[in-house]
Amino acid sequence: MTRGIDLIEEVARHYGYDKFPPRLPPAKQPAHRLPHAEAQDRLRERIVALGYQEIVEIPIVDTQRNELFRPENLAPAVIGNPLAEDASVMRSTGTVSMLRAIEWNLNHGQRNLRLFEIGKTYELRDGAPIETQVLTLGATGMAQEKTIYEAAREFGFADLKGDLDRIGELAGGFAWQSGGPQWLAGSRAAQIALAAKSPDSANLGTTGQLAKRIADIYKFRQDVFVAELKLEPLVTGVEAANAARRFKPLPRFPAVERDFSLVLADGVAFAQVDAAIRSLQIAELESIEAADLFRGGQIPAGKFSLMIRVKFQSAEATFTDAQLNDISARIVAALQEKLGATLRAI
């Protein structure tokens, strides 16, 4: 015996190890939550409430699959001694892992999937590995199975966009712009930013339907939709929106809706219409919705008709016709000036 612990060991051995109660030693450091843990919990709760299941994927992926989604400006983080050919690089995007999970489930008979993952992506920058946390969503299959009450309906881009809007409500809302990376279908792809302007809000992520050439590589026989968002600016937006939240009393006066049937040039997005109206900073503005879209008939070629429904709510008094007419005139003037819109009817 050379140390005090040796004597303790001998005493314990003679006394009998089986006689010591099975207790863990007390923790010497207080437990603490990681940064943004509460905001991440709120995101998880919202996504699960929307019907998604959380997955945890291995971040080591196949090089060829990773190259399908790797942005050209990101250098891949290649593993020096890979255990297998299909596990030779750290993933550059969360999408490649999400599609692997969807592929496995489809091959095993699971046709209706709503999945999400919070995990890291990897790249090399100046020879050093960089890790970025992302939120990835994937969905495919039926949005509504056939019942005696409802007809069957496949999950579509509008369903995913609606789910993302619900998630974005936690961060003050999302701003949308059409288009996305080449692995998404051009007509069903969008870029997402936080509605609240900040240095990190401009390029939050992308979403859309998987392009046909990518779906063919995976041998998908049904439409697959994905979304990938940077987690750091998203949770920061959740925290900022939560801090700015204030109590709002229930309205005492009725809300009023006005419909505007507009004729717009092809290529004008609803997001532009929404932004043009909101730029007027009408205090009583409650919501703007796209109610109907029409092409053909008396609508000239190269144009389309969009009916929007605008809701107003005053906390001080019931609207008069004069007030509504004044607000409506301002909206029409703004749409004419900024988007070249013409009004069919109010």
What are these regions, as identified by a protein language model?
Residues 20, 55, 118, 288-291:
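Generic beta-strand hydrophobic packing signal
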Residues 49-51, 73, 112, 131-133, ...:
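Short, well-ordered loop/turn elements at secondary-structure boundaries
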Residues 1-113, 311-313, 319, 323-346:
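Extended, well-folded interaction surfaces typified by the phenylalanyl-tRNA synthetase beta subunit core
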Residues 14-25, 29, 33, 75-80, ...:
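Residues forming anionic-ligand binding surfaces in small-molecule and nucleic-acid pockets
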Residues 53-54, 77, 113-114, 136, ...:
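Structural motif
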Residues 60, 84, 120-123, 142, ...:
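Residues that form or immediately flank small-molecule/cofactor binding pockets and catalytic motifs
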Residues 82, 93, 119-121, 138-140, ...:
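Structured loops at beta-to-helix junctions and adjacent beta-edge loops in soluble globular domains
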